[in-house]
């Protein structure tokens, strides 16, 4: 079982021509749906409102095969993100979070997740920012079994991060237990403002405690860099006509984690860069299909079989 923890929200997608569309979203939410669509055993841990938006969020999780027993229902209104698309389909985000559903995840909500002793735990995005959710998920990371693979998708959101110094400190603490880290070049610039990209990648790929850690660094349509300690592999992304980039990184990370768990891989296998690269290649195919559609609409397992 994979547990994905963090926010579920509504993306209000604003197109360059002025059209607006309300779409289910949130990095962890998209990740859970992707794994479910690919056929993985996955549960979502997070707060979901009882309002109409929340009902839609819950229904889509269920439709995609995501277990709901760790979902915490609340009367708080659904958290909202406004995603403004430019002419290339790239999205920039603003968030409306005060008094809404996602941030209020409390420490009492993680007992069920710990009882599962999951094979993998995935977290990131606003789950590293919004309180008390961020403190709760940091505690969860510190308490999962040693056998649980922890994957963190940094997915930094500067516009939702009032205290960048405190945020960086929390991320560093969480990454100390992380086995797989997905970052973008924008994330690296935000986490390490005083370092160039290569130095930042080296810093995040080489934990002070030693051990094996895989870093997957994305850069939009440019090649993905797979880093395991000092080893590097550059992976070209599949060519695709982009409709929009909403959910692209989530789809990539979910595809990687699904492939890793499906293949019976463990934390120890992260030393094998060829294995990490193979899972990243699968993730890039998942992301390529996602960006060819409007909104965060990841592919199903049957679609991945075409051209495999």
Give the location of each predicted region:
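Active-site metal-binding loops of divalent metal-dependent hydrolases
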Residues: 8, 27, 126, 154, ...
């Amino acid at each position: 079982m994979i547990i994905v923890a963090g926010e579920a929200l509504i993306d209000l997608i604003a197109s360059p021509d002025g059209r607006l569309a309300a779409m289910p979203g949130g990095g962890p939410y998209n990740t859970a749906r992707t794994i479910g669509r690919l056929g993985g055993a996955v549960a979502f841990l997070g707060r979901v409102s009882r309002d109409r938006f929340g009902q839609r969020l819950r229904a889509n999780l269920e439709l995609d095969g995501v277990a709901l027993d760790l979902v915490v229902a609340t009367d708080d209104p659904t958290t909202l993100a406004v995603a403004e698309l430019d002419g290339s389909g790239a999205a920039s985000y603003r968030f409306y979070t005060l008094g809404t559903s996602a941030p209020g995840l409390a420490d009492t909500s993680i007992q069920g997740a710990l009882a599962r002793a999951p094979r993998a735990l995935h977290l990131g995005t606003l789950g590293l920012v919004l309180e008390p959710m961020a403190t709760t998920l940091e505690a969860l990371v510190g308490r999962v079994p040693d056998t649980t693979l922890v994957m963190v998708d940094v997915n930094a959101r500067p516009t939702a991060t009032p205290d960048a110094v405190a945020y960086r400190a929390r991320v560093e603490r969480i990454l100390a237990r992380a086995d797989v880290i997905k970052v973008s070049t924008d994330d690296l610039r935000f986490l390490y403002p005083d370092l160039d990209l290569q130095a930042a990648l080296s810093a995040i790929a080489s934990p002070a405690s030693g051990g094996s850690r895989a870093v997957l660094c994305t850069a939009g349509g440019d090649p993905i860099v797979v880093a395991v300690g000092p080893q590097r592999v550059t992976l070209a992304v599949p060519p695709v006509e982009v409709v929009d980039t909403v959910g692209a990184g989530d789809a990539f990370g979910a595809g990687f984690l699904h492939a890793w768990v499906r293949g019976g891989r463990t934390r120890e296998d992260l030393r094998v860069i060829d294995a990490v690269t193979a899972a990243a290649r699968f993730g890039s195919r998942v992301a390529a299909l996602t960006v060819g559609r409007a909104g965060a609409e990841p592919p199903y397992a049957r679609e991945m079989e075409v051209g495999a």
